[in-house]
């Protein structure tokens, strides 16, 4: 399958959309018809996409109850929130600003 429980997200300065899964469920956990992979990631949807896109998680942004993501256009840093009562604010520093799939540091 693709992604589940996509909550909020955010537009990037380069025009793509970040979508956030707000459920870190995985195989062995019941969700609909069952799961075959881990969830709880952020995904980037390319601005130029004209059809379905193969979902590839931005693993370096962590796996948790993601709520939203916002990119600072001056630094390229991504600020992430969680959808939990005891949540925190995260900052992701990309290895290459504007190329989130290249990894970075949370």
Question: Over which residues does each language-model region extend?
Answer:
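Conserved small-residue
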Residues: 1-106
């Amino acid at each position: 399958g693709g992604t589940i429980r996509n909550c909020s997200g955010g537009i990037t300065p380069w025009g793509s959309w970040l979508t956030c899964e707000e459920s870190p469920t995985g195989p062995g956990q019941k969700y609909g018809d069952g799961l075959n992979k881990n969830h709880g990631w952020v995904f980037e949807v390319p601005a130029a996409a004209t059809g379905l896109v193969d979902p590839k998680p931005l693993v370096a942004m962590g796996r948790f109850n993601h709520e939203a993501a916002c990119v600072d256009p001056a630094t390229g840093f991504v600020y992430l929130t969680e959808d939990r009562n005891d949540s925190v604010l995260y900052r992701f520093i990309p290895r290459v600003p504007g190329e989130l799939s290249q990894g970075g540091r949370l």
